[in-house]
Amino acid sequence: GSVTNDSAEYGIIRMVVSDPQRALEALSKEGFICRDTDVLGVELDDNPGALDRLLVSLLDSNINVDYLYLSFNRSSGMPIMILHVDCINEVKNCLQAKGHCVL
């Protein structure tokens, strides 16, 4: 999955890839400025209210999210919410305890 963001000065493309090191090398070789950032993937049920349940879990646990975007699991077709948070392991444990499928 990928998401873009741009301004007058620069653009940002966020990508989830299977081989981050290879992607960094390929993009850097072409002159792109790259940064590897850890994110958390949470598989959502494909039904109304699934995103709300995830967001309520984050809110109830007082978890701040820097950014999020939606992707999908190519094998299952299920939606995956990609989250950037400060403490990935803590958030992972918290969401798993609340019944969310953390990837």
Regions found by a protein language model. Name each.
Residues 1-103:
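A conserved regulatory-domain signal marking ACT and ACT-like small-molecule sensing domains
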